[in-house]
Structures are given as structure tokens and as C-alpha cells.
């Protein structure tokens, strides 16, 4: 039969196991399932940006990766927009979104970077 000490030890281990599963950090949305709240931007993101910015193998900064986006955002909206419109390194001109307006590009960049871009 179980002794009182064994029961307490078992209960303590079970409790510690449950507590170790708790995490006070909010769950981050992964690049693969992130979607803008604006329906138009969501469609544009899905049809053009997502191909590279949700694929770690592409080398593009991943959607929601603030560490990767931070130095880019620090360059300012004009530079980000210029790189988007004209292409930069492996990014094709217009990010393959020929129908996107500059305002939409800024909205998409802001969504991917996790900041408001003006």
C-alpha cells in the first residue's frame, strides 16, 4: 500500500508537472498562419507576400519576426517602400503584387513587421 509520504510525493510531482506546462508569455502567431485583419490586405498578403515571408527557406524576414524586421523598420518608410517597389536583394519588384498601391504596401509591411508604418 502507498505510504503517506509516497502519496504526497506523487501529488507534488503531478502538481509540478502541471505548473511547468503553464507559461505566462503570450503565444506568438507564426508566420505561416498570420493574416492581416483587413480583408483586402489579407487577400493581397496571401497571394503575394506569404510565399516568401512565411517561408523560412526564402531568406526573407518572416512575418512577425520583430528581430529581423527591426533594422529594416529603422531605415524608415521611404526606404522600405523603395525596396518594395523596386526590388531589393532577393525581393522582386513590387513583391509580385502588381495591383498593390503604395498605401497597401505600407499596410502589408507594417503587418509583417508588427508595427504601424506611415
Give the location of each predicted region.
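Bacterial N-terminal signal peptides that target proteins for export
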Residues: 1-11
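Bacterial signal peptide processing site
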Residues: 22-26
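Short Cys/His-rich Zn2+-coordinating modules
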Residues: 29-36
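Short sequence/structural segments immediately N-terminal
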Residues: 38-46, 117-118
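The canonical Cys-X-X-Cys-His
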Residues: 45-55, 108, 112
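Gly/Gly-Pro-rich "capping" loops immediately C-terminal to redox-active cysteine motifs
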Residues: 54-82
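Axial heme c-ligation environment in periplasmic c-type cytochrome domains
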Residues: 61, 83-116
Amino acid at each position: 500500500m502507498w505510504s503517506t509520504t509516497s502519496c504526497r510525493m506523487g501529488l507534488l510531482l503531478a502538481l509540478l508537472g502541471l505548473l511547468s506546462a503553464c507559461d505566462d508569455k503570450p503565444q506568438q502567431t507564426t508566420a505561416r498562419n498570420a493574416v492581416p485583419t483587413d480583408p483586402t490586405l489579407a487577400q493581397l498578403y496571401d497571394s503575394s507576400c506569404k510565399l516568401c515571408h512565411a517561408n523560412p527557406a526564402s531568406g526573407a524576414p518572416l512575418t512577425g519576426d520583430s528581430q529581423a524586421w527591426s533594422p529594416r523598420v529603422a531605415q524608415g518608410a521611404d526606404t522600405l517602400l523603395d525596396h518594395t517597389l523596386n526590388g531589393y536583394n532577393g525581393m522582386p519588384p513590387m513583391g509580385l503584387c502588381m495591383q498593390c498601391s503604395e498605401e497597401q504596401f505600407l499596410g502589408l509591411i507594417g503587418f509583417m513587421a508588427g508595427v504601424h508604418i506611415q
